[in-house]
């Protein structure tokens, strides 16, 4: 069975891994997933990720980040723009998520970036997901 939303699958795997207190999680790799993981790493939500190749298929393995007392660094991670309903936003219409404690991840003409970086560059785009 083919998968229609690879990004939602990645976000669900990360969310389930945090709920299960796993150290690592892996899933099939793609360019958009790598771009989203770059933003998550830059914002401090994950430790690191590596791309491995098995049987001519590339996989991404993500090292999850926990606090000293064992709390997950990601409390919520949700898909906003879906294949059936794309959500676009100008940067002036995008309010802070959880009083600027969380982030939106946007796909812009300048690449995938957080809402904080998009505010600096004054550019809007497709709202991929929100993370807190």
Swiss-Prot record:
Entry GO CC:
ribonucleoprotein complex; ribosome
Q: Which UniProt keywords apply?
A: Ribonucleoprotein, Ribosomal protein, RNA-binding, rRNA-binding
- For the keyword Glycosyltransferase, the answer is no
Kindly indicate whether the keyword Repeat belongs to this entry: no
Write out the GO biological process terms.
translation
* Gene Ontology terms for molecular function: rRNA binding; structural constituent of ribosome
Q: Which SUPFAM superfamilies match?
A: Ribosomal protein S8
Recorded hits in InterPro entries, A to Z, give: Ribosomal_uS8, Ribosomal_uS8_CS, Ribosomal_uS8_sf
Protein family according to the UniProt entry: Belongs to the universal ribosomal protein uS8 family.
Q: What does this protein do?
A: One of the primary rRNA binding proteins, it binds directly to 16S rRNA central domain where it helps coordinate assembly of the platform of the 30S subunit.
Recorded hits in HAMAP family, A to Z, give:
Ribosomal_uS8_B
PANTHER family (alphabetical): 40S RIBOSOMAL PROTEIN S15A (PTHR11758)
Subunit and interaction comment: Part of the 30S ribosomal subunit. Contacts proteins S5 and S12.
The molecule here is called Small ribosomal subunit protein uS8
Instruction: Name the gene behind this protein.
Output: rpsH
């Amino acid at each position: 069975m083919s998968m229609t939303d690879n990004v939602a699958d990645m976000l669900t795997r990360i969310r389930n891994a945090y709920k299960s207190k796993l150290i690592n999680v892996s899933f099939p790799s793609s360019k958009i997933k790598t771009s989203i993981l770059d933003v998550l790493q830059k914002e401090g939500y994950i430790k690191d990720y590596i791309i491995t190749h098995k049987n001519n298929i590339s996989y991404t393995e993500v090292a999850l980040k926990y606090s000293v007392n064992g709390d997950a660094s990601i409390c919520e991670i949700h898909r906003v723009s879906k294949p059936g309903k794309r959500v676009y936003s100008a940067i002036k219409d995008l309010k802070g998520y959880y009083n600027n404690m969380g982030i939106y991840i946007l796909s812009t003409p300048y690449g995938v970036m957080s809402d904080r970086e998009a505010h600096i560059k004054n550019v809007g785009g497709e709202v991929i997901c929100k993370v807190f």
